[in-house]
Amino acid sequence: MSPVHRSRTSQTQEAHKPTSTLSFISPPQPPRQDPKSPHILCSQPNACSRQSHVSYPNPWGLPCSQSKVSPPGTATNPNPKEWSRISGPPVSLDPQPWSSAPFKPTAQLPLLAQSLGPPAKPALPDPALPLQML
């Protein structure tokens, strides 16, 4: 029983040492992390980034209080057909735009590889050669 009591007393003494140092360091911390003052919270970079992640997406980069804004298409122009009338006729996107082009990269790649021939040797010599020469 005596070694158990000795270990407990040593643990309590070790536990009292960090609390004394923490009590010395802790008084300047509460005014920095006061949850009642949003100005101090927003001055910290982590606080604003957390709130912007909650109200994702936020492409405008607004502060925390103005992060909940509707997307550009819904706020100013609720009719999507007017956007197509303003920007012009809809453009049909070709899934393979090179299929109609005269230069087809897929057809030219084998010819390019044949014209180059075997792969060129590296500029640096083999590391085993200088050892053999020495």
From Swiss-Prot:
Tell me where it mainly resides: cytoplasm
Keyword Transferase tagged:
no
State where composition is biased (Polar residues).
Answer: 9-24, 43-55, 64-79
**Localized where?**
Cytoplasm; Nucleus
Transmembrane residue ranges: none
- Keyword tags: Cytoplasm, Nucleus
Summed up, the tissue specificity of this protein is:
Abundant expression is found in prostate, restricted to cells of epithelial origin in normal and diseased glands. Very low expression is detected in pancreas and ovary.
Q: What does the UniProt induction comment state?
A: By androgens.
Which residue ranges are recorded for the region named Disordered?
1-134
Give any Gene Ontology cellular component. nucleus
Q: Which domain of life is it from?
A: Eukaryota
Has the keyword Cytoplasm been applied to this entry? yes
- Pro residues compositional bias, start-end: 119-128
Name-wise, this protein is: Putative protein KRIP1
What is the native source organism of this protein? Homo sapiens
